[in-house]
Amino acid sequence: MGVLAAAARCLVRGADRMSKWTSKRGPRSFRGRKGRGAKGIGFLTSGWRFVQIKEMVPEFVVPDLTGFKLKPYVSYLAPESEETPLTAAQLFSEAVAPAIEKDFKDGTFDPDNLEKYGFEPTQEGKLFQLYPRNFLR
C-alpha cells in the first residue's frame, strides 16, 4: 500500500465503502445469510426444519468413458492450431453451394423453394432469433 493511500485511510473514518461487498464482510449474522453464490435446493419450514426438493438438486450426467483412448489433458507445449475461424461464406460454400449447383445443373433448382437448402424465411418460433436479435452477444 502506498504512503498516500495509507494517509487517506487514516483520515477517513468508518467502514471502507470503496471495497467490494463480499460474503466475508459485515457482522456474523449477515455473513451467514449472504452465502457464496450456491443455489438453494430446498426451503426452511417455520420450525427451522430444512425440506429438500428433489427437482432443485443439480444432477450431473457423466458419460461412461471406459475404453476411451484420449486423455483429458492438453500439454502447454502443444503447437497452436492453424485453423482460421469459419465465416458465413465458407459455411455456405461447403454446406449449401454443392447442392444448389447440382440442382442448377439438373434443371430442378427453384428459387422459390429455398427451404430445401436450409433457408428459413421467418424467425418466428425460434428460441434465438437473428432478427430482431433477442439474445446477448
UniProtKB/Swiss-Prot annotation:
Q: Which InterPro entries match?
A: Ribosomal_mL41
- An example Gene Ontology CC term for this record: ribonucleoprotein complex
GO biological-process terms attached to the record: apoptotic process; mitochondrial translation; translation
> Where does tissue-level expression of this protein occur?
Present in kidney, liver, thymus and testis, and at lower level in brain and spleen (at protein level).
- Where is this protein localized, as stated in its record? Mitochondrion
What stretch of residues directs this protein to its organelle as a transit peptide? 1-13
Any GO MF annotation of the entry: RNA binding
On the tree of life, the source organism's domain of life is Eukaryota
Keywords assigned by UniProt?
Apoptosis, Cell cycle, Mitochondrion, Ribonucleoprotein, Ribosomal protein, Transit peptide
Query: Its biological function?
Result: Component of the mitochondrial ribosome large subunit. Also involved in apoptosis and cell cycle. Enhances p53/TP53 stability, thereby contributing to p53/TP53-induced apoptosis in response to growth-inhibitory condition. Enhances p53/TP53 translocation to the mitochondria. Has the ability to arrest the cell cycle at the G1 phase, possibly by stabilizing the CDKN1A and CDKN1B (p27Kip1) proteins.
Subunit text:
Component of the mitochondrial large ribosomal subunit (mt-LSU). Mature mammalian 55S mitochondrial ribosomes consist of a small (28S) and a large (39S) subunit. The 28S small subunit contains a 12S ribosomal RNA (12S mt-rRNA) and 30 different proteins. The 39S large subunit contains a 16S rRNA (16S mt-rRNA), a copy of mitochondrial valine transfer RNA (mt-tRNA(Val)), which plays an integral structural role, and 52 different proteins. Interacts with BCL2.
Q: What family is this protein classified in?
A: Belongs to the mitochondrion-specific ribosomal protein mL41 family.
Q: What is this protein called?
A: Large ribosomal subunit protein mL41
| Biological source species | Homo sapiens (Human)
